[in-house]
Amino acid sequence: MFDTYLRRWDLVPDGGPILSASGGVLPVTRHAQPAMLKVATCDEERRGNALMTWWNGNGAARVWLHDRDAVLLERACATPTLGELSAAGHDDDAIRIACDAVARLHAHRAPQPPATVPLRDWFHALLAHARDDGHDEVLRVSAATAQRLLAAPVDEAVLHGDIHHGNVLNFGDRGWLAIDPKGLHGERTFDYANLFCNPAHDLAVDRARFERRVALVADAAQIDRQRLLQWIVAWAGLSAVWSIDDGRTADTPLQVAMLAARSLGLK
C-alpha cells in the first residue's frame, strides 16, 4: 500500500502504520520534515483526500503532495488533543476550537470544489429505518426531523461531514486544523452536530453540559439554537442507526437525540 509512494515521493517511514478497511496512514519524513502519508482504498476516502487538497490548508491540514489515491499531509502535534482538553475540564475551549476550525472550512470559496455527497444521500439509512414500525420512537422523531431539514436547507456549504474531537488536531503554529473529511454538501449547521456525541459518553449525555454546549456552538457558529437542536436530533439518529446496523451499542447517540428532542419539546 505504501511502498509506491515511499519511492515516488522520497519518503522515509517514521513509525508504524494504522490500517483500516478504507485505507491506511503511515508517519513519514520527507527531507527531514515530519508528515503523514494517507492512502485510500475506497471512494469515500478518495473523496476526502480530494477535499483536503481543495481546502489547501485553510482550516485543514496542509496537503504537500497528492494523487488520486494518496495525500502527503503535514503532521499534527501529539498533544494536547481536544478530547484531552475536555477530560481536563476545558470542554468549553475544546468546543470553541472545533467551531473555529469548522468556520474556516466553510469560509473557503476556491473555484471547482471536488465531487461531494448530498446530505439527503448521507441520511439514507435513517430515512429507511423510519419506515420500520419496530424501531424506537426516538429514531422516528430523528427521521421526521431530518426529512424536514433536508427538504428546506439553508446556508449550504461544502461540508467536512465528520467533525469530532479526534478530527480537529493541534498543528502548533498553524493552530487547530481538521483532518479526515467525508466530503459532503448541504446545510452548514450539520457539521456541528457530531460534536455533541463526543468525546465521551458521560460528558455527551450530561444534560447541563449538553445545554451549555448548545449555547456555545450557537454563539460561536452564529446559528439559530432551534435549528442546531434539530440537526442534533437528525444526526444523532443517523449515528444510532449506523451503530445498530454494525452491531454496536447506540446508547450515546440515542441519549443525545433524546436530549435535543426534549429541548425542542418533541419528546
Predicted feature locations:
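A general structural signal marking secondary-structure boundaries and capping sites
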Residues: 9, 102, 106-110, 199, ...
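An alpha-helical support segment within catalytic cores of ATP-dependent transferases
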Residues: 2-4, 107-161, 171, 219
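Small/polar glycine-rich anion-binding or flexible loop at a beta-alpha turn
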Residues: 21, 231-237
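Active-site Asp-x-Gly
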Residues: 171-225, 230, 251-258, 264-265
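Regulatory N- and C-terminal appendages and interdomain linkers associated
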Residues: 1-14, 45-48, 136-141, 208-209, ...
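Active-site acidic catalytic loop and adjacent metal/ATP-binding pocket
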Residues: 18, 24-29, 36-37, 63, ...
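Conserved NTP-binding catalytic cores of kinases and kinase-like/nucleotidyltransferase enzymes
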Residues: 1-60, 66, 171-173, 260-267
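A conserved alpha-helical element in kinase catalytic cores
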Residues: 32-72, 76, 80-105
